């Protein structure tokens, strides 16, 4: 069995925990979808997290991905990290163990200051990164802003490596 560790990183309120919840639900790990705003998200277990509606401590969950060709499955450890700048040290600690990262960007809010910081940290730690534009179903969402930003930053980052 292959094993991968994938971290979800983003500016606060970009939807990391909700994305993790959806992935776990679709993989059959969860029987019901929880919600951060309902205080029943699977990965936000601490009472402070539930009261504030934000992730404070990095959490892990494991799901199994079947192989497309029916050979070897992949065990995926998903790390949901804090997005609030006050807890960025907790997110940075997780970078050392990641095989890949998913940088979540809100389609309604676009790239935020902490998104920039995370992008630079991911480059410094040389973590291969996917960008996921979230909240595209909400009014005011515009994928063009985060996508064009990501394209520009990817070229800048590769030029410095």
Residue spans for each PLM region:
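P-loop NTPase switch module centered on the Walker A-proximal segment
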Residues: 1-105, 109-111
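Conserved beta-strand/loop subsegment of P-loop NTPase cores
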Residues: 101-104, 126-134, 153
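Acidic, proline/serine/threonine- and glycine-rich low-complexity intrinsically disordered segments
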Residues: 146-148
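N-terminal low-complexity segments that are often proline-rich with Ser/Thr-Pro
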Residues: 159-161
